[in-house]
Amino acid sequence: MCLTNGKDRSKCLIVLLLPVFLMCGCIKHEVLSPVPSITGIRFVDSGQNATMYVEFTDGDGNFGLEQSDSLGIFSECINAYNLYAEYYELQNGNWVHIKIDPCDDPVPDPDVPYYYKIPWAKPTGQNQIQDGVIEIALTSWKIESDFDTVKFIVRIVDRDIQSSNAFEIGPLVK
């Protein structure tokens, strides 16, 4: 039927190509939660210093802070950070949280260990999903104490102040 004349061939071509175009429109794009998620952490100890690699996803692509983020919800001290690594020591068989909070000080210390401002890598294009690895250089990560085993519980927070899952790394021997 498609081989008889030019008019029929055009109709046949349309009928044959229509399913191809419809299938292309049905390609599913990955959908992730708009709440950020930590998917893994790798910790590399190099003596006094260490590096923490935090693997994460964010479905709406709004994880990260800009330098100008200091007003509104970001004016509260705790919201000025977006990666929190809480420090715990194993003391006499129990994990004890060693609170190091920059917001407890009337003049917050910008260099407080374990709270970080991760810059915003704005996604471009239609797919706004962020899927990446954050590299954190931990200088002097070993707090002086009588105990030698520690762990971190890490979480990230996006621009909507949505907190990720808490991800535990450790035990680590100092």
Predicted feature locations:
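Leucine-biased recognition of intrinsically disordered, low-complexity hydrophobic segments
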Residues: 3, 16-18
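C-terminal motif of bacterial Sec signal peptides marking the signal peptidase cleavage site
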Residues: 22-25
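Non-catalytic macromolecular-recognition regions in eukaryotic signaling proteins
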Residues: 27-174
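N-terminal secretory signal peptides that target proteins for export/translocation
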Residues: 1-9
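Sec-dependent signal peptide recognition
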Residues: 10-16
